[in-house]
């Protein structure tokens, strides 16, 4: 009996320590609806936000502050600070060794999308190099282009996706490189006609994750991943998913 009590005490201490350490991390995100964004009251919300709150519950971590900022700023802090969690971050081949990861939040298609009325023909990705392309600065859409040898002088970077969409609709760029789901959500929220837009190329299908600064301990990331895995298998997650991605 004493041995069992001792083991239980050690287990409780370990869980408490993990929750305390998870509470020392800085949680950063961006306006990227429906995964993460601010509601009309200015509070962070979205699928990834609610998922994170469920992970905190599973790991006995008190709710933490979530800071919404431009993606490029959050990505910079992730590379420079020792205790940052940035989400939802696409886990690309180029990014994989730079950070530690807890996955998945979800999956997304990164596409080149333009106005349907424009007579663009892409038979191979290199054909897109003839056109001016917009992207969110430091976003996966921009990084995939650079990784594929695109001239950064032909990539017009915006701080936020609404700015990038405005560049497309005003004719400043021919294509946008971005997450298809997020862009179509933005198009709907701005009451634009989805039929005016066309996907000309799919760059990649990526997994969205929580990215941790590399100095964060493996044990802490594992603790977070364990909590995330439990949440993803729960009925609570099914409800969250149906809320933001309702089945037709």
Label every model-predicted segment.
Residues 13-15:
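N-terminal signal peptide c-region/cleavage motif recognized by signal peptidases
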Residues 20-97, 157:
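Extracytoplasmic small-molecule ligand-binding "clamshell" domains
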Residues 29-31, 108-111, 188-225, 247-248:
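Periplasmic-binding protein-like
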Residues 33, 42-54, 116-150, 156, ...:
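Bilobed "Venus flytrap"/periplasmic-binding protein-like clamshell domains
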Residues 46-59, 139, 210-244:
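Extended ligand-binding regions for polar small-molecule ligands
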Residues 52, 73-77, 164-167, 173, ...:
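Short, hydrophobic alpha-helical packing/hinge segments within bilobed ligand-binding/sensory domains
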Residues 53, 65-127, 140-141, 199-202:
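Acidic, polar ligand-binding/catalytic clefts
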Residues 62-65, 140-156, 195-196, 228-248:
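Ligand-binding clefts/hinges and TM-proximal coupling segments of bilobed small-molecule sensing domains
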